[in-house]
Amino acid sequence: MNFETVIGLEVHVELKTNSKIFSSAPAHFGAEPNTNTTVVDLGMPGVLPVLNKRAVEFGMKAAMAINCEIAKHTKFDRKNYFYPDNPKAYQISQFDKPIGEHGWIEIEVGGKKKKIGITRLHLEEDAGKNTHTSHGYSLVDINRQGTPLIEIVSEPDIRSAEEAYAYLEKLKSIIQYTGVSDVKMEEGSMRCDANISIRPIGQEEFGVKTELKNLNSFNNVRKGIEYEEKRQAEVLKSGGIIEQETRRFEEATGKTSLMRIKEGSDDYRYFPEPDLVDLFIDDAWKERIRAEIPELPDKRQIRYINDLGLPAYDAMVLTLTKEMSDFFEATLAAGADAKQASNWLMGEVSAYLNAEQKELHETGLTPENLAGMIKLIEAGTISSKIAKKVFRELAQNGGDAEQVVKDKGLVQISDEGALRTIISEILDNNEQSIVDFKNGKDRAVGFLVGQVMKATKGQANPPMVNKLLLEEMNKR
């Protein structure tokens, strides 16, 4: 029996506000444990929450960016549960009236585009963080408690681990462009749970789902889904049944393990938050927030293709992160050719960032010095090979491209007389290569070009070397 996988994703995104959603405590990552707290975060008796207006506006902006309808009337609710990182024994969330509903984003997998529906986007507060020690006790940090979150719940439209990966990449990109979050999984500002079920191909009814947690990277989301697909298929094929449960992905083994039997909404005993009034959003407020949304990746991608003549693949890669796309645009503004800038950013720059585990702003590279280097290549001042040395110097130490070329003595040798002298000496020492060339062996030319480049430490003008080599060999 063959099965179809059905996946829905729940993504939590921390909003980049200065203070928490219901208190005045700072909402910044990396502070000493239990220092970013107030009596509201600690759940002290008699204290009252005060709603952070900017968090609401960030939620509206994110919802609009993923094509959600914004509620005219929304409210907050208490989600009741006890856990050490939740001092109040309830979480303020949104239950039946979320701030955004009925959205969608478009993904592309294997050259095929597909719309993934968004059920809802709602606001809530984050919980604290438990650290479990090897000594039999746990440590609780309340700093994260009360940090504003949006939870984005997809429709069960995703059919594979690859589609889930593409959805998360696209969602991260869109949220990043809006500026409402850093969406850094390594810092916990973007987290994902996956609801996974399988059903026989052709069956309309959904199978029993399991919720998968502890997915701390996009790759782990993919691996967790792939493992869970196989596990559920093996259970059904052996005559067993799938239990509705919450499972943990174990990164060390690549497997999932049981955490608990899955709760339903009734277990949380939701009821309206009595300490917060309902929220009414008028058209004027919505339009003001909509005007703050910048050009999003899909539109920017189309502009790169239509206006700059870039291939679709280049446009997609360049717009995947806002930092890369903004850097590309600034490089063009500094006078670089679009295709050359694209090639460098997608090639050498991306390879360097991956190898060094850095982001663009953590290097010495700027749009101005990258554009300056590209202009030097176009002017024939340096070769593409030498440009790689210049690039590495700029990336590591910054500075001006032209000055680096002068200081390092990297100007391309284009003096015909000097090159003829070098070529003549190399031909004198490689007479067999001349014979091979005249016998139709083209590899001989490549070998001789290599010898010239070696003699000039890569600074000879390659097209001129080819031209002069042929001329000199034909004279002999």
From Swiss-Prot:
GO terms for biological process: glutaminyl-tRNAGln biosynthesis via transamidation; translation. Disulfide bonds: none annotated. It catalyses: L-glutamyl-tRNA(Gln) + L-glutamine + ATP + H2O = L-glutaminyl-tRNA(Gln) + L-glutamate + ADP + phosphate + H(+); L-aspartyl-tRNA(Asn) + L-glutamine + ATP + H2O = L-asparaginyl-tRNA(Asn) + L-glutamate + ADP + phosphate + 2 H(+). One of its GO terms (molecular function) is ATP binding. InterPro entries: Asn/Gln-tRNA_amidoTrfase_suB/E, Asn/Gln-tRNA_Trfase_suB/E_cat, Asn/Gln_amidotransferase, Asn/Gln_tRNA_amidoTrase-B-like, GatB, GatB_C_1, GatB_Yqey_C_2, Gln-tRNA_amidoTrfase_suB_CS. Keywords: ATP-binding, Ligase, Nucleotide-binding, Protein biosynthesis. The keyword NADP does not apply. It comes from the Bacteria. Its EC number is 6.3.5.-. SUPFAM superfamilies: GatB/YqeY motif, Glutamine synthetase/guanido kinase. The keyword Nucleotidyltransferase does not apply. Allows the formation of correctly charged Asn-tRNA(Asn) or Gln-tRNA(Gln) through the transamidation of misacylated Asp-tRNA(Asn) or Glu-tRNA(Gln) in organisms which lack either or both of asparaginyl-tRNA or glutaminyl-tRNA synthetases. The reaction takes place in the presence of glutamine and ATP through an activated phospho-Asp-tRNA(Asn) or phospho-Glu-tRNA(Gln). NCBIfam families: gatB, PRK05477.1-1, PRK05477.1-2, PRK05477.1-4. PANTHER family: GLUTAMYL-TRNA GLN AMIDOTRANSFERASE SUBUNIT B MITOCHONDRIAL AND PROKARYOTIC PET112-RELATED (PTHR11659), GLUTAMYL-TRNA(GLN) AMIDOTRANSFERASE SUBUNIT B, MITOCHONDRIAL (PTHR11659:SF0). Heterotrimer of A, B and C subunits. Belongs to the GatB/GatE family. GatB subfamily. This is Aspartyl/glutamyl-tRNA(Asn/Gln) amidotransferase subunit B. It comes from Listeria monocytogenes serotype 4b (strain CLIP80459). The gene is gatB.
